[in-house]
Amino acid sequence: METKVRKKMYKKGKFWVVATITTAMLTGIGLSSVQADEANSTQVSSELAERSQVQENTTASSSAAENQDKTEVKETPSTNPAAATVENTDQTTKVITDNAAVESKASKTKDQAATVTKTSASTPEVGQTNEKAKATKEADITTPKNTIDEYGLTEQARKIATEAGINLSSLTQKQVEALNKVKLTSDAQTGHQMTYQEFDKIAQTLIAQDERYAIPYFNAKAIKNMKAATTRDAQTGQIADLDVWDSWPVQDAKTGEVINWNGYQLVVAMMGIPNTNDNHIYLLYNKYGDNNFDHWKNAGSIFGYNETPLTQEWSGSATVNEDGSLQLFYTKVDTSDKNSNNQRLATATVNLGFDDQDVRILSVENDKVLTPEGGDGYHYQSYQQWRSTFTGADNIAMRDPHVIEDENGDRYLVFEASTGTENYQGEDQIYNFTNYGGSSAYNVKSLFRFLDDQDMYNRASWANAAIGILKLKGDKKTPEVDQFYTPLLSSTMVSDELERPNVVKLGDKYYLFTASRLNHGSNNDAWNKANEVVGDNVVMLGYVSDQLTNGYKPLNNSGVVLTASVPADWRTATYSYYAVPVAGSSDTLLMTAYMTNRNEVAGKGKNSTWAPSFLIQVLPDGTTKVLAEMTQQGDWIWDESSRTTDTVGTLDTAYLPGENDGYIDWNVIGGYGLKPHTPGQYQPTVPSTPIHTDDIISFEVSFDGHLVIKPVKVNNDSAGRIDQSRNSGGSLNVAFNVYAGGNISVKPSQKSINNTKETKKAHHVSTEKKQKKGNSFFAALLALFSAFCVSIGFK
């Protein structure tokens, strides 16, 4: 058998770990020396089955973390939660007969299966052991014995296969057993279940570079490091040039608007020395309404200058107390347990001083952990639950608390989490068709794809990312957890990470947003294609509800709101999207992010920095679109002075010399076919003029001089419109309302581009570049158009 060597990366909490894997041996890197939230590692391959062997009685001491430099990988039991023995095969038609191990193991544990009972929200349910939980999972997926036909299918399985259009005689034994395990309904409470089909649609939208969702191009030459990020480091105490990434403004907890704090705007940011295990939070400030990126200043590390990698502070949110102090909500991370990331939601009161030039941190008090066990165990996975089955691949999350206050003055935290026993991770989730969301044909095809790919199967077994919500009680400076609720969003079987949630109220609706990397999902085909075509797989997802604590539905049908536009190692790559309300608007949001992935992936000295912000519009029908409005870097408050063209780019200007080489250094992807896109223009939600059905003359003109004109009957809502087709290959598609009169506004479309390395530079046709060539061409076009109107009787 040929030995193959490839580099793989996996994410442990917010830490990326690089490993070289062969068919027999893995060499790891100590977790204490790697960094959080490293995005150029987008190629994450689930090494669940390859990294280590799960013992039948796994304990809380993770030997995988302890011995990852010397672990011998054995091709025996999978490391998914139910210790499945499903073998990897290249074809679904291959007959597999070794499921006896699963059935035997399940039968042994059937009598020990534990019944999961709901616990009180204030009392973490950690009493149920993982052995019992595992036994329950295995019992749930045991193949039923009441097969009824010659193919070994149950009545339900036969119906599913028939609806899917499958030739029953072609089914393998493995596929028959899988179909017999399928559940069509689930009693588990999930909030909105992010389905496999939704994930698929999100990836396809990213690949298509739909301009409604594709992040605008930025001018790479205009991007600079943040001056305020050259500051005293929290760990070393020395002045250093720091990366700045996840950031959040001090906001009104009810409206979400950036607070004017004594004439200043305040922002809390994660910062650290590149290529160092240095993850702490700092307070940044600028005059309120000042759009100059260079005017931002640094008040320093919020928790002082004796910080260590053992105790870190990750993302959160902040608001202002009645006495003017800040109430900070953040993630306190303890890495002392074999370098694992024990994440807990925490809060602290930050007392500030100021004058007309500066803001100072005077003291920090009331620093307390709100969730000492991590999750409560029932709604959300606790640290102990995760630790007892962790073998080096499963992601744990209890982080990024976002504070929001309702009309009654009650405060809630929305946060990233992992599902608890209410809807736990496990192999049985693969056979739960409520997780798929498609037709029988789609669901069965996807199920069989899992059977074909051990990596995907394992990812699906572990995946249990969620967006959670809890209610606070008590004094606002020293709050306590009052109640945990069922997740607002769950993604069992689909994704293992949904980051940085925030909720914004627009009008009478609540909008939930979260950032994610698709490579933390189980659909390897989808995110690998995104990497191949675009070079990155980051997205922002959005959901809407009439209530804060439940009822969320995906925006744009799938949940997609923003998609990556450029490769992960370009200077203008972005992530960690955070939506900020625009004062006085009920349908626009300012989208903020950091730019340039951490640890100098875009080149030496090109640190992570704040990106230019841009607008999106939220429409009444539950759709959104990116608008052609952009700011300078680090603008958190949109007003008329925010608008600039300095940072606006095209695909030609979105990269620095040497970046557009068709290669991303994660060792698996080479080449990508980027597509141009143009953000939309702002449109009021209430039309200013009535919609009429008029005679429209449409015509297409190509640059080689061909003209095609034909009158058609369409619905038109303005004096004229220009349609740009991504597939037009340089043609103009113009529709003109004859009755309205006026001038024709003609804009060349974006030309299609070649996917090869030599020609994948943007063929972005700008008015400037084509103006000289276009003036005489468009004059001739107008003359032809006028003659045509007269010839058919229009005046």
Curated annotation (Swiss-Prot):
InterPro entries: Glyco_hydro_68 (IPR003469), Glyco_hydro_beta-prop_sf (IPR023296), KxYKxGKxW (IPR022263). Its EC number is 2.4.1.10. It catalyses: [6)-beta-D-fructofuranosyl-(2->](n) alpha-D-glucopyranoside + sucrose = [6)-beta-D-fructofuranosyl-(2->](n+1) alpha-D-glucopyranoside + D-glucose. Residues 1-36 form the signal peptide. It is a single-pass membrane protein. Keywords: Calcium, Carbohydrate metabolism, Cell membrane, Glycosyltransferase, Membrane, Metal-binding, Signal, Transferase, Transmembrane, Transmembrane helix. The keyword rRNA-binding does not apply. It holds the Pfam family KxYKxGKxW_sig. This is Levansucrase. The gene is ftf.
